[in-house]
Amino acid sequence: MIGRLKGILVEKHAPEVLIDVGGVGYELQMPLTSFYELPLPGAEVIVYTHFVVREDAQLLYGFIHKEERSLFRLLIKANGVGPKLALTILSGMTAKEFIGCLERDDIATLIKLPGVGKKTAERLLVEMRDKLKSLMEASMGAEREFVLKSNFTPAPVAATVEEDAIAALLSLGYKPQQASKAVSSAFQEGMDPEQLIKAALKSML
C-alpha cells in the first residue's frame, strides 16, 4: 500500500493533482480542504495517501493532514459511503467541522452536501459517534507537512476564476445550476479560485 508520497507537484486541477516521485507521476484526488493548501506547481510536497483498488480502476487519494486521511478511512467504512462521497464530505467541511456536526447531531448541515440525504446523514451520526473520541484525538494531533521550495512560474491559465470554481464544484457532485448560482453569488472582484470555492461552499451549507 502507498501511504505517503514526497515529490514535485507537477499539475493541479481541482480535485486532481499530479506528483512526480523519482520520475514516476502519481495521479491523486484530494479533498478541496487539502487541495488549496498545496503550493504552486514546481514545489516539493509531502502528502499522506490512501490507495483504493476496484475491479475497473486503481485510485489514489491524497491528504495534507493525517487527521483528514483518518477521517476519510472511517467514512468509507460507514454503510453507504464510498470514496467519492467521503471526498465530497471532506471538501465541504474540515475534519473539525465534521466532528462538530457529530457533537451537535447536526443533520441539517450534513444534508446540504451533495450526495448526502437524510438517511445517510442519520446513519453517519449513529455510526461515527462511537468513533468521535479517536477523531478528536487525531484532529488535535494533526501534522502539517508540506515544503515550499519553488522558483517555478506557472503557465498562464485560460480558464477564469469563476470557471475554475464551477468545475471544482461539479467534480464534487454539485449540479451545474447549483454550482453556477453559488459561484455567481459568492464572487467578489480580486478573489482567487480557492477563496471563491470556499465562499461558494459556505453559502450552500
UniProtKB/Swiss-Prot annotation:
SMART domains: HhH1. This is Holliday junction branch migration complex subunit RuvA. InterPro entries: DNA_helicase_Holl-junc_RuvA_I, Hlx-hairpin-Hlx_DNA-bd_motif, NA-bd_OB-fold, RuvA, RuvA_2-like, RuvA_C, RuvA_C_sf. It is found in: Cytoplasm. Residues 1-64 are annotated as: Domain I. Belongs to the RuvA family. GO terms for molecular function: ATP binding; four-way junction DNA binding; four-way junction helicase activity. Residues 157-205 are annotated as: Domain III. Has three domains with a flexible linker between the domains II and III and assumes an 'L' shape. Domain III is highly mobile and contacts RuvB. It comes from Shewanella amazonensis (strain ATCC BAA-1098 / SB2B).
